[in-house]
Design a protein with these regions (language model features):
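Helix-adjacent hinge/juxtasegments
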Residues: 57-85
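Acidic active-site catalytic centers that drive phospho-/nucleotidyl reactions
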Residues: 14, 76, 127-129
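Residue-level recognition of conserved beta-strand positions in structured domain cores
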Residues: 46, 55-57, 137
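Core segments of cupin and vicinal oxygen chelate
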Residues: 2-3, 9-51, 79, 86
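N-terminal beta-strand motif that seeds the catalytic metal site of vicinal oxygen chelate
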Residues: 1-17, 68-70, 136-145
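Vicinal oxygen chelate
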Residues: 32-33, 42, 72, 81-145
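Short, solvent-exposed coil/turn segments
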Residues: 3-5, 37-39, 48, 63-67, ...
Length: 145
């Protein structure tokens, strides 16, 4: 049985500010629906992704900016980092985990520079609310992925 991740709900404080930010990343605006009362749903999709994000009003009880560890897979982390910086995003330097497996929480065990292996290099940025995203470079997928 296939199960595919379709959407991630992000907690944000200011829907319009978040919409401007994610559109500035080059993400496709799929919907901006205003419902009854204060209910609103905005959906955007990163380039090449089958999974979208949604945020709005009345969607989640999670506090704005509370998500950490959202992953965006890229095939060239340096080029993606440069493009995001050119779009006005504050992106960390490229790093890898000193333990060589996966990045630790926060900034612990960050080693400077790329790992020069698929799955091993990361960079991070946050949206205006503080939801933290990670770029992860994958050049060759593991079998079955």
């Amino acid at each position: 049985m296939d199960m595919k991740l379709e959407v991630v709900i992000l907690p944000v404080a200011d829907v319009d500010r978040a919409k401007v930010f994610y559109e500035s990343l080059g993400w496709r605006l799929d919907a901006d629906f205003v419902g009854v009362g204060a209910f609103r749903v905005v959906q955007l999709t990163p380039p090449g992704s089958a999974c979208s994000i949604i945020f709005g009003s009345g969607l989640t009880s999670s506090p704005p900016g509370s998500y950490d560890g959202l992953q965006l897979v890229v095939d060239d982390i340096e080029a993606t980092r440069t493009e995001l910086i050119e779009r006005g995003v504050d992106v960390s330097e490229v790093f890898h985990d000193a333990g060589g497996v996966f990045h630790h929480a926060g900034h612990e065990a960050r080693a400077a520079g790329p790992a020069h292996q698929s799955y091993g290099s990361f960079a991070s940025f946050s949206d205006p609310d503080g939801n933290e995203w990670y770029l992860q470079e994958i050049t060759t997928r593991l079998p079955g992925r």
